[in-house]
Structures are given as C-alpha cells and as structure tokens.
C-alpha cells in the first residue's frame, strides 16, 4: 500500500521545536502503516529531538527560515527556506500535502506563485473550522487570503468548502456572511453570490448574520477575507475575554462555592469552543492540499492540524473539489 506523504515545515514559528517534533513522532506512530512525514528544516536541530526514531523521518535540510516578521519582498531572498523547499516538493508531487505554522501572508503568496490555482478559481481562501455550541464546526472562509472579491469568488469558495464539509455532513447547509438576512442587504458582490448560490444545487439557506455563527446555523459560511477575518478574530477575542473574566471572578473568596458548582459547566463550554481541537486552516483554491496552523502553535495544535491534513488527503478531497468545480462549470 502506498503511503500518504506529508511535508511538515518545522521552521518559522514562535514556539519551541520540541512541540512540532513530538507531534510528528506521536502522529506518525498512530498511523505508521500508511503514513510518511517528511520534516523540512535544520537537520542538526531536528535529529537530536527524534532520538532513535530519526531513521523513520526523511529530512529535507535547510538552515534558512521565513520568520513571522518577514514580508513577501524579503522572503523572495530566501529561496532555500523551509517553506519554499516544502512548496517545491509539493509542486513536484513528492508529497500529498503540507503543513506549516509559518508567516501566513508569505505562505499564501508563495503557495500561489509555486503551485498555482485550480481551474475556474481566481482567488485563494483561508478556511478554518470554527467550533460551535453543539460540538460541531462551521467551515468559515475566507478569513484573510483574499480581500478584494466578487460574487463568483464567493460562489467558488462555497463549492470548495462544501466538498470538505461533506466529510462530516451529508448535505451541508451553505450561507453567505452579511449584515442582515434579507435578500436586499449587502454589497453588490453579496447580491451576485446570492443569485449564483440560489440557482445551484448546493443546500443554500441565504444570508447569515455574524451573531449566529457559533450556533451553527450553517455548515459552510462564505465571506470576503476582510469581513471573515474580523468575524473570526472577534469570536476569538470575546472567548478569551469571557474566559479571563470568569477566572478572575472565581478567584474571589465570595465566589469560591459558585466556582466549585459551575466548574463542570465551565469545562464543557471551554471544550466546546477550544480552537486547539481545530487548529488547522486550509488554503483552498490551490492545486494542492495545504494547511496552516497558528504561528504560536503548541503540541496539541500540531496534532490537530496533522489530523486534519491526514484525513483530507486520505479522503482524496483535492480530486473531489476538482470534480465538483468541473460539474458546476460544465466540464
């Protein structure tokens, strides 16, 4: 049986290298029958962390890293960086997918320049999984890759995200993020996307307001990169603020009894909205399976992102996306 090959960029993020190497080892041993993980980075730093397992992991050596403060322009001077090398390996079909925690803007630009877009696609999109109150997720895209979009772009985002959502839900509900649910609301590209989606065979429910995202009114929610990014960061910020507020209140002597009683509920809420369980965001629209995790990712987040990447490759999602796009565009 041919093994799934994953490229793992080990450089350019804010946390210790131990997190990514431990995640690589543990995830490999969970799937060693059909998985190979190719580590891209500084071999002198990676090998000691692998201990006796170093023979199990091919290493693409480089000492050049794209840093979080690099720009697209400065990154061009680092053609031998771990990110560039991994992308070239993916383009040359030496692997099935790639995971990085590196610089987001540089990653999207270089992935676009190296791998290219799928047929029918004009813009890429970042798609994270947003945890919802019922324990599920909403596929939210775009959250920052493409700010200047039209209705066709949103329509294409919906097709691609719908393909991935079908891995979890047989008939995913699709919506467009807007300031109201009425058909006349929004900008021209909202109206254009609305009309295109209405005439498609997707399970389209219409416009969706930001206040219902966490209630999983839809399984796929499409937006321009500016609005989607604001929505995502607002949810993350509110979650952290409420969590910190409750922690501070529970520390007060007068609230100790209430804290003990509500601790199980608090843990349940925290688990429901834990982004670490869904720490990988797809870069959709490119001719490859690419996942980006947080620049400050820890062991758990790398494990989560590897799981997302592995399952997507195993389900042959890239070819399914191509089929769905061709079906809509009559090829």
Curated annotation (Swiss-Prot):
InterPro entries: FA_synthesis (IPR003664), Phospholipid_synth_PlsX-like (IPR012281)
Metabolic or biological pathway, per its Swiss-Prot or TrEMBL entry: Lipid metabolism; phospholipid metabolism
EC numbers, comma separated: 2.3.1.274
GO biological process: fatty acid biosynthetic process; phospholipid biosynthetic process
Keywords of this entry: Cytoplasm, Lipid biosynthesis, Lipid metabolism, Phospholipid biosynthesis, Phospholipid metabolism, Transferase
Primary site of residence: cytoplasm
UniProt keyword annotation of Lipid metabolism present: yes
Transmembrane regions: none
Top enzyme category: transferase
Subcellular location: Cytoplasm
Top-rank lineage group of the source organism: Bacteria
One cellular component (GO) term of this entry: cytoplasm
Single GO term (MF): phosphate:acyl-[acyl carrier protein] acyltransferase activity
Catalytic activity: a fatty acyl-[ACP] + phosphate = an acyl phosphate + holo-[ACP]
Family: Belongs to the PlsX family.
Record text on subunit structure and interactions: Homodimer. Probably interacts with PlsY.
Protein role: Catalyzes the reversible formation of acyl-phosphate (acyl-PO(4)) from acyl-[acyl-carrier-protein] (acyl-ACP). This enzyme utilizes acyl-ACP as fatty acyl donor, but not acyl-CoA.
Database matches in HAMAP family: PlsX
Protein name per UniProt: Phosphate acyltransferase
Organism: Ureaplasma parvum serovar 3 (strain ATCC 700970)
């Amino acid at each position: 049986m041919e093994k799934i090959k994953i490229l793992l960029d080990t450089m350019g993020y804010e946390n210790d290298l131990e997190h990514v190497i431990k995640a690589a080892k543990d995830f490999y041993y969970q799937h060693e029958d059909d998985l190979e993980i190719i580590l891209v980075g500084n071999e002198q730093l990676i090998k000691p962390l692998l201990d006796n397992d170093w023979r199990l992991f091919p290493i693409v050596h480089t000492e050049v890293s794209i840093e979080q403060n690099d720009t697209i322009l400065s990154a061009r001077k680092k053609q031998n960086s771990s990110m560039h090398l991994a992308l070239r390996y993916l383009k040359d079909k030496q692997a099935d997918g790639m995971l990085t925690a590196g610089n987001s803007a540089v990653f999207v630009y270089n992935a676009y320049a190296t791998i290219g877009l799928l047929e029918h696609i004009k813009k890429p999109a970042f798609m994270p999984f947003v945890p919802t109150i019922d324990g599920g997720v909403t596929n939210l895209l775009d959250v920052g890759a493409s700010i200047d979009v039209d209705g066709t772009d949103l329509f294409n985002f919906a097709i691609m995200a719908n393909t991935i959502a079908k891995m979890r839900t047989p008939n995913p509900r699709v919506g467009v993020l807007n300031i109201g649910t009425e058909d006349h609301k929004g900008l021209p590209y909202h109206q254009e996307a609305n009309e295109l989606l209405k005439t498609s065979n997707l399970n389209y429910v219409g416009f969706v307001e930001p206040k219902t995202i966490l209630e999983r009114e839809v399984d796929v929610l499409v937006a321009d990169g500016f609005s989607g990014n604001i929505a995502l960061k607002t949810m993350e910020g509110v979650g952290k603020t409420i969590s910190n507020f409750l922690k501070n209140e529970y520390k007060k002597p007068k609230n100790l009894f209430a804290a003990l009683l509500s601790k199980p509920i608090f843990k349940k809420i925290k688990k429901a909205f834990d982004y670490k369980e869904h720490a990988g965001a797809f870069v959709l629209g490119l001719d490859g399976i690419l996942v980006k995790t947080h620049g400050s990712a820890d062991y758990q987040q790398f494990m989560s992102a590897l799981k997302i990447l592995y399952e997507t490759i195993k389900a042959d999602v890239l070819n399914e996306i191509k089929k769905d796009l061709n079906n809509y565009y009559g090829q």
